[in-house]
Amino acid sequence: MVTSLYRNGNGRLNSYTQDTANLGVVNQLCPLPKTPLFGTDGIRGKVGELLNASLALDLGFCAAQVLKATMPTPGPIIIGQDSRNSSDMLTTAITAGLTSAGVEVWQIGLCPTPCVAYLARNTEAMGGIMISASHNPPEDNGIKFFDHQGLKLSKGLAQQVEDLLRNTLESNSQRESSLSWGKYYHRRELIEQYLQQLSLSIPTDVNLEGMRIVLDLAWGAAVEIAPQVFKSLGAEVICLHDQPDGDRINVNCGSTHLNLLQQAVKEFGADLGVAFDGDADRVLAVDSEGRVVDGDYILYFWGQTLKAQDKLPNNLIIATVMANLGFEKAWQNLGGQLIRTAVGDQHVQAQMWETGAMLGGEQSGHIICHHHGVSGDGIQTALHLAALVRQSGRSLGALVEQSFQPYPQILRNVRVEDRERRCNWKDCNPLQIAIAEAQAAMGDRGRVLVRASGTEPLIRVMVESECAQSANYWTEHLIGVVQKYLA
């Protein structure tokens, strides 16, 4: 069964589905891996290998079945995308799968991931899909799913989608035809709702007039919305990488490459700069001297503000295992609590719901504040950081100097292309021995974290220590072991 798209007399895109013997041919050439498809942020990989049009088509059909069976009420699916060259193709294919299952699709085009999450929660939609690989390079892409509450699919629902997909492909069975085809609508006007809530999340007595702010938009999903909302609040905005560009998204720019932002902030005499990733669900900042302000600092500043306003239950912040020990100790010295989770904003979100925490996030810049939404939002976080600086009457650099001294922390990545070897790295005995040696040597003055990336073919090695020399030594030792036995 193959679904084609066509426009009717009203210009709406509808689907036509017919049986064919060729369904799944592309997937037969690129079989699904034995390891789980869903990582820490949906399905992600290199386009043309794991991700292709055939997989997106089948995935859309299977996701439609699961969502229709589990969401409280039927409704449309909202689809947004970033600027990658492959995003149009994957959007079209997954739309065909959804509409062939009888689900209506609202396509909103280029937008940040948090926009899809917000609209899934605040319209009659039964879910949302974002086509993006976040901070990954241009040749990658990904598919993120949200439920009707704007939350990423639970592990249970994601597993149901994956199980149905595997059964469909492995049995090479034909899908049962829907009694009626779903329709497709272009609903870009919905983005205005998201823009309005961004502006309304800032206190009405705060404006950014007189502040000069540099925005690194990473050639990605934030290029239209971020400048618009900062300007609407009175800021003087200087934009870098401010056009959608599928060839250059995240390339030497954005939240993973801050050099150009640091230079621009100093060159233009800006108060601060912020850098988004390709889908704008995370943000990092730099102060007027070009010093990096990561997610730990943002959590600390925002936590202080909410604590002073009595809006932070139990003075609790949820962070991940990557959070710096210097941040944790400083927050505890203020009477705060910090709970760590595994890496991934989905884990942070789950712990926030479980504990009733209102603030959580990651060092990498995914920040969630339940006072303003249920998902990490880079643009919203950047707005609040700028507002906090304005309200404080001090510079961002002064706030950093008065906060905490981070422990020396070194993070290195080793590329491991073999998916099964990467996912089963804990079975590597020499690496486990090396980790134990490093941790024993540093004792309670440092820590080691080794993990497989949930979004890229990497083994990540992090060593943190009071002593920079010790951190450097053990990082190099562990990297050598990973390269020898896994790479």
UniProtKB/Swiss-Prot annotation:
Q: Is Phosphoprotein found in the keyword set?
A: yes
Asked if Cell inner membrane is a keyword of the record, the answer is: no
Enzyme Commission numbers on file:
5.4.2.10
PTM annotation (Phosphoserine): residues: S134
Co-factor(s):
Mg(2+)
Tell me what PTMs the record reports for this protein: Activated by phosphorylation.
Q: Which UniProt keywords apply?
A: Isomerase, Magnesium, Metal-binding, Phosphoprotein
Q: What top-tier enzyme class does this entry carry?
A: isomerase
Q: Which GO terms describe its cellular component?
A: cytosol
List the InterPro entries.
Answer: A-D-PHexomutase_a/b/a-I (IPR005844), A-D-PHexomutase_a/b/a-I/II/III (IPR016055), A-D-PHexomutase_a/b/a-II (IPR005845), A-D-PHexomutase_a/b/a-III (IPR005846), A-D-PHexomutase_C (IPR005843), A-D-PHexomutase_C_sf (IPR036900), A-D-PHexomutase_CS (IPR016066), Alpha-D-phosphohexomutase_SF (IPR005841)
Catalytic activity reads:
alpha-D-glucosamine 1-phosphate = D-glucosamine 6-phosphate
Q: State the Gene Ontology terms under molecular function.
A: magnesium ion binding; phosphoglucosamine mutase activity; phosphomannomutase activity
One biological process GO term for this chain?
carbohydrate metabolic process
Concerning HAMAP family, the annotation shows: GlmM_B
- Which family does the record assign? Belongs to the phosphohexose mutase family.
Q: Known NCBIfam families for this protein?
A: glmM
Q: What is this protein called?
A: Phosphoglucosamine mutase
Source organism:
Gloeothece citriformis (strain PCC 7424)
